[in-house]
Every structure is written in structure tokens, then in C-alpha cells.
């Protein structure tokens, strides 16, 4: 509202529930003329943390009763009360009780004088996190004075200081004087002095954050620069001068050496100069070698990309035959280790070269670096933060190599199986014709790569996973000695997996021993993890053989073929028997006697019982 001109103006505030004045009471206000102040609107989002009682409590100690002309009024009503409907709901606004009842709001187009209080401006720091983007200014907090709150929010003020509108915290620093009174100007000046000092502190703190550059520590292995010819002469003569004059200072010794150098003949000087030149040449050579060594060390520290392939044993190209009852071979993906495992991009060029060479040829070994955080907690290694996976040109049923798809993200949703170091012996043509065969390119896994082990024993690890095989850490079952000179009759191995999914890293593998002449075994093997050294890198060397994903079980039929005998002379199939087999149609020319047939069958049965005890059911036909 506008007040008419005059020196004595009275503002009557009416309202049945006003906490300060009744309708008959008035208070005196000085005239400010007809000046009008434009108060800019302020848009605030709803903030449930701003309650009316909190804001009122903030101003409990801000009233100055001593500066008021009406002592009784200031003593009784000195507390500034603020109604803050900052976009709040009606229910929250009613928490203020009588402060909001009766429609008691002021439209303050004129500033009420500072006769009742000489306090500096009251500021409210509003966090900018929930504000609209329009209020995001130069600083994290916005300062709002009472006049803005009173005009925008309809505040009831009990004699508090009213300031001219402030558009921003920076505008408050301008030199324009306030039109109210000298007391008000003093308060604003004090407020002005405080703000630049605060800004200066912030700037100084920002400058102090810059850490001084640290000097590089000199490498003790770095070759030292050669000294000059004069320095060589100084070294030679200093000891002699010190011996003659023990009390001579360094400056005196230097003067004596300088005079001796000047009086030295040119030929003697050339001797020292030649020594210096030779030392420079040696220094340059040593420096070049030192730099090369530093670069090599930096390359080794990042990733060692030169794998050491284990010893390889030649084996015939195996052929896996799938039982017709099982579904068609599905795509086989690496095991789901994490929601997304992206292989290091440094292998992309290497992958491109492998893709051009195709599936044929000698497979190369690729290292895939997978961080420890990407692996589930059940298979994290206790020795380090990195797990190095070395698949040897993995061939899946899609006909793709894992090395070629290493730049793609491994999908975690599909459960898949990696069978490592499993060599399925060649199947006979007659038996293979009755079963569904996989295409030849997908049936060529790399040659058997064996771990460095005694030739008489091969470790087999079987992991249990819902659809396929997976490693379970069970106590090793009874050792079964099988001496295969030729392949036994076809075995059908049916794996009935457990309902629970477990992957463990400390492997206690069941052991199947074969004869020294036949170190190869025909049992599928999974996830052989080796820890060659106590370093922080573990290596998993995996050879993936295509397999069939079946909802309940997986049938792998091993059909006897024509294996490559490692010994020049065929021997009996039974483990431990060194006799040559006799010709017999019933035994397929594999046994030397009926006793060996019975013992071999007993060993196979015991192996089946042991595997059943370790939660792997193997049916032997």
C-alpha cells in the first residue's frame, strides 16, 4: 500500500489472531516520501525441510530492543516472526498456528523505517540443491533479505529492519547509498566489509590448494655425467695440496689449483681433455642403454603380452558326437563372470590378425585381463587383484574364436560352460554316422596343452553348474588306474548337475591315472587354475570345446577310434598291465586275458561309484 505524504503516519494492522497487536493498537512509522521500490519476484521450489518454526527460531535473537523508541513494544514484541510459505502445502503452512490465520499479510511497497532496530540485514542461506536452474548463480548459497521475503512470501514483520530489494549478492556490494537512515547505512557498510573478506579467504584457499611441484628423485642407476678436464686435474692435485697444507681452506686450495692449471703445459692439459672425451662417449652409451632399459621396464609393468605356452602334446583331431536325443548345439559363451566384462582394447589389433588367419593353423594364446572387481565374490582369488585368463584360440559352436570376439561384452545372462584340457578321442566313422555330427570347423580344438606334471598322472577337475559341468571341491575319490592302449567300448557319460550353482577356486581334483605310455585322459576337465608364483596375477588356461546346453543333462558319447599310440607296441587296456593284447572279436583286440577284462570293468565301476559320491553321476554302458 502507499502512504500519503506527511511526517506522522500510522499503519493500522488488523487481524483477529495477530500475535502482536490488537486492532485498536497502532505504532509509529517515519515517513519515507513517495519513493517506490521494485521488488523482484523470487521463485523457490518446495523444500519440506523448511518449516515455519525453524525460520522463526532463526530470528529469535535478532531483535534489538534498545534501539526502539517504544520500549514496551520492543520488549514485548521484539522477536521477529516470519511466515514462510515457500511453495509448501496448505497442511504444512498451518503448522504456524495463528501466524497465518486471518489473512494477515502485508503488501510492502514502501520500506518500513529502521527506527525500531538498527540490526544489519538478516540473511537466510538457502541451499541451491533443490532450487530451479534459474537461481543457480555464482555461488552455492543465495542470500535473501527481509524485504524480498516480505514482498514475495507475505511475511508478517514485528518491527524488523527492511532493506531495499537486492537482486543478487553481488548487487549488495554496490556503492549506492540506502535511502533509509544513517544507522542502516552503517549496518550495510559492516555487511559490505564482511563479504569481501570472505571472498578473499576463499580465493586464498583456492590458491593454496595448488601443490608445489616436487623435484624428481634421481635414479641411482642413472649414469653420472662426466666431469671436465679441469675437474679431473683438481681431483688429482687436491689431495697433494691438502697433504702439504692441512689447514688450508677450500678457497685457498682452489686458488692454488687454478694457478697450477694455468701454468700447466698444453700437452698435459690434452691428457686430461682426452680422458674427458672418452668419459663423455662412455656416458652417452650408458645413457642410451639406461633409457632403453627404462622403456622396457615400463612396458613390462603395464601388461605382459608375451605368454609362455605350456608344453604341448600332439594328439589326433578329436571328434565329438552328440546324442540325437539331446537338442541341437546352442551357442556357447564364456562363463558369466560379471554383468559386463569388456576385454582390454589393446587386443583389438591382435584379434584382427587372428580373424584373418581363420580357425585353421597353429592356435596362438591370448591373455585377457579381467579385474578382480568384475568377478563374483565366490571365485575371487585371494592372491591378487587381477585374474589373467589365457584361452588358447577358443572354438565355440558358432565357429567363432574367443580371441576374435574378445572386444565384445560378455553377456552374463546366459549360463555357459568352458571345458578345459578335455581331449575327446577320435570317434570311429561307423559310430559317428549314427549320431549328429558338428561341422568340422567347429570340432577342431587346439592340440592338448598339458600342465607340467609327472607323466604318470593327469589331474581332472569337474565343476558342477546347473546346465553343464562345473568344478566342485570334493575330496578326491578313489584313484582308478586305466591303461588305454586302444579305446574301450563306447562310454556314455551323463552328468546330472546339482540344483545349486557353486564356483570355487581352491580345487581338489579327482585324479585318474593312466599308464606312462598314455598320459592323455579322456575325461572332460574344467577350469584348471594354476598359481605358479605368489604374484598378484593368476592364470586360467582354458581350451574350450563345443558342447551342448541341455535343460537337464548332457550326454557325451565317446566312440572308440584309431588313436595314435604313444608306445611303439600296443598293450593291454587295463591299467598296469604290460602284456600285449590278444586277437579277440569280443574284446575288440584290447585285452590280454579274461582276468584283465574283469579287472578293467571293476576299475570302471569303482570310478563310477566314486564320481557318484562326488555328486557326478556317470553311467557306463
Swiss-Prot record:
Q: Where is the composition biased (Polar residues)?
A: 510-525
What molecular function does GO assign, one term? chromatin DNA binding
Matching CDD domains: HMG-box_TOX-like
Query: Which keywords has UniProt assigned to this entry?
Result: Chromosome, DNA-binding, Methylation, Nucleus, Phosphoprotein, Transcription, Transcription regulation
- Which SMART domains does this entry report, sorted A to Z? HMG (SM00398)
Which residues carry the post-translational modification Phosphothreonine, per the record? 176, 313
Which portions of the sequence form the region Disordered?
A: 153-227, 305-333, 510-529
| PTM-bearing positions, type Asymmetric dimethylarginine | 481
Sequence motif: Nuclear localization signal, positions: 213-218
What's the domain of life for this entry? Eukaryota
The ranges the UniProt entry gives for DNA binding are: 223-291
Q: Which GO terms describe its cellular component?
A: chromatin; nucleus; PTW/PP1 phosphatase complex
What is the activity regulation entry? In liver, recruited to target gene promoters following treatment with dexamethasone and cAMP. Binding is decreased in presence of insulin.
Tissue-wise, where is it found? Expressed in liver (at protein level).
**An annotated GO BP:** RNA polymerase II promoter clearance
The record's note on quaternary structure and interaction partners says: Component of the PNUTS-PP1 phosphatase complex, composed of PPP1R10/PNUTS, TOX4, WDR82 and PPP1CA or PPP1CB or PPP1CC. Interacts with PPP1R10/PNUTS. Interacts with FOXO1 and CREB1 (increased by cAMP); FOXO1 and CREB1 are required for full induction of TOX4-dependent activity and the interactions are inhibited by insulin.
Its biological function? Transcription factor that modulates cell fate reprogramming from the somatic state to the pluripotent and neuronal fate. In liver, controls the expression of hormone-regulated gluconeogenic genes such as G6PC1 and PCK1. This regulation is independent of the insulin receptor activation. Also acts as a regulatory component of protein phosphatase 1 (PP1) complexes. Component of the PNUTS-PP1 protein phosphatase complex, a PP1 complex that regulates RNA polymerase II transcription pause-release.
Designated name of the protein: TOX high mobility group box family member 4
* Annotated organism of origin: Homo sapiens
Amino acid at each position: 500500500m502507499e502512504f500519503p505524504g506527511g511526517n506522522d503516519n500510522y499503519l493500522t494492522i488488523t487481524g483477529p489472531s495477530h500475535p502482536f497487536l490488537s486492532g485498536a493498537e497502532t505504532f509509529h512509522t517515519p515517513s519515507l516520501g513517495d519513493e517506490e521500490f521494485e521488488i523482484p519476484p523470487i521463485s523457490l521450489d518446495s523444500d519440506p525441510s523448511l518449516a515455519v518454526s525453524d525460520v522463526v527460531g532463526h530470528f529469535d535473537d535478532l531483535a534489538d530492543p534498545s534501539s526502539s523508541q517504544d520500549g514496551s513494544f520492543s520488549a514485548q514484541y521484539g522477536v521477529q516472526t516470519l511466515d514462510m510459505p515457500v511453495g509448501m502445502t496448505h497442511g504444512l503452512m498451518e503448522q504456524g498456528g495463528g501466524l497465518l490465520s486471518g489473512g494477515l499479510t502485508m503488501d510492502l511497497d514502501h520500506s518500513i523505517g529502521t527506527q525500531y532496530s538498527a540490526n544489519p540485514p538478516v540473511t537466510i542461506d538457502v541451499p541451491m540443491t533443490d532450487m530451479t536452474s534459474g537461481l543457480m548463480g555464482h555461488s552455492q548459497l543465495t542470500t535473501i533479505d527481509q524485504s524480498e521475503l516480505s514482498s514475495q512470501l507475505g511475511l508478517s514483520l514485528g518491527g524488523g529492519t527492511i532493506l531495499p530489494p537486492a537482486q543478487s549478492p553481488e548487487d549488495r556490494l554496490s556503492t549506492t547509498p540506502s535511502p533509509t537512515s544513517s544507522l542502516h547505512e552503517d549496518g550495510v557498510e559492516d555487511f559490505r566489509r564482511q563479504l569481501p573478506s570472505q571472498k578473499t579467504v576463499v580465493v586464498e584457499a583456492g590458491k593454496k590448494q595448488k601443490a608445489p611441484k616436487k623435484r624428481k628423485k634421481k635414479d641411482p642407476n642413472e649414469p653420472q655425467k662426466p666431469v671436465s678436464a679441469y675437474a679431473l686435474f683438481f681431483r688429482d692435485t687436491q689431495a697433494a695440496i691438502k697433504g702439504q697444507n692441512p689447514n688450508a681452506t677450500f678457497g685457498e686450495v682452489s686458488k692454488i689449483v687454478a694457478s697450477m692449471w694455468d701454468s700447466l703445459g698444453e700437452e698435459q692439459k690434452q691428457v686430461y681433455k682426452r680422458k674427458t672425451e672418452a668419459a663423455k662417449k662412455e656416458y652417452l652409451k650408458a645413457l642410451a642403454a639406461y633409457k632403453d632399459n627404462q622403456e622396457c621396464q615400463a612396458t613390462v609393468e603395464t601388461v605382459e603380452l608375451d605368454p609362455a605356452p605350456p608344453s604341448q602334446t600332439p594328439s589326433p583331431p578329436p571328434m565329438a558326437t552328440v546324442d540325437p536325443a539331446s537338442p541341437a548345439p546352442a551357442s556357447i559363451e564364456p562363463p558369466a563372470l560379471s554383468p559386463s566384462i569388456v576385454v582390454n582394447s589393446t587386443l583389438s589389433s591382435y584379434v584382427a590378425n587372428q580373424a584373418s588367419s581363420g580357425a585353421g593353423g597353429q592356435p596362438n594364446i591370448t591373455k585377457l585381463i579381467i579385474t578382480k572387481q568384475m568377478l563374483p565374490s565366490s571365485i575371487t582369488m585371494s592372491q591378487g587383484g587381477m585374474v589373467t585368463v589365457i584361452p588358447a584360440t577358443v572354438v565355440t559352436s558358432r565357429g567363432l574364436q574367443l580371441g576374435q570376439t574378445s572386444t565384445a561384452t560378455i553377456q552374463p545372462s546366459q549360463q555357459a560352460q568352458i571345458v578345459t584340457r578335455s581331449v575327446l578321442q577320435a570317434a570311429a566313422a561307423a559310430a559317428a554316422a549314427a549320431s549328429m555330427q558338428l561341422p568340422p570347423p567347429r570340432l577342431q580344438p587346439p592340440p592338448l596343452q598339458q600342465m607340467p606334471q609327472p607323466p604318470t598322472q593327469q589331474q581332472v577337475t569337474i565343476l558342477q553348474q546347473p546346465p553343464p559341468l562345473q568344478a566342485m571341491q570334493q575330496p578326491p575319490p578313489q584313484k582308478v588306474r586305466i591303461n588305454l592302449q586302444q579305446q574301450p567300448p563306447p562310454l556314455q557319460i551323463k552328468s546330472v548337475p546339482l540344483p545349486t550353482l557353486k564356483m570355487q577356486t581352491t580345487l581338489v581334483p579327482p585324479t585318474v591315472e593312466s599308464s606312462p605310455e598314455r598320459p592323455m585322459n579322456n575325461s572332460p576337465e574344467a577350469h584348471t587354475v594354476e598359481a605358479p608364483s605368489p604374484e598378484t596375477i593368476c592364470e586360467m588356461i582354458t581350451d574350450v570345446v563345443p558342447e551342448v546346453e541341455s535343460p537337464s543333462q548332457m550326454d557325451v558319447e565317446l566312440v572308440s577310434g584309431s588313436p595314435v599310440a604313444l608306445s611303439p607296441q600296443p598293450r593291454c587296456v587295463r591299467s598296469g598291465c604290460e602284456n600285449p593284447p590278444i586277437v579277440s572279436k569280443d574284446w575288440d583286440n584290447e585285452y590280454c586275458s579274461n582276468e584283465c577284462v574283469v579287472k578293467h570293468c571293476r576299475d570302471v565301476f569303482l570310478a563310477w561309484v566314486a564320481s557318484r559320491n562326488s555328486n557326478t553321476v556317470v553311467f557306463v554302458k
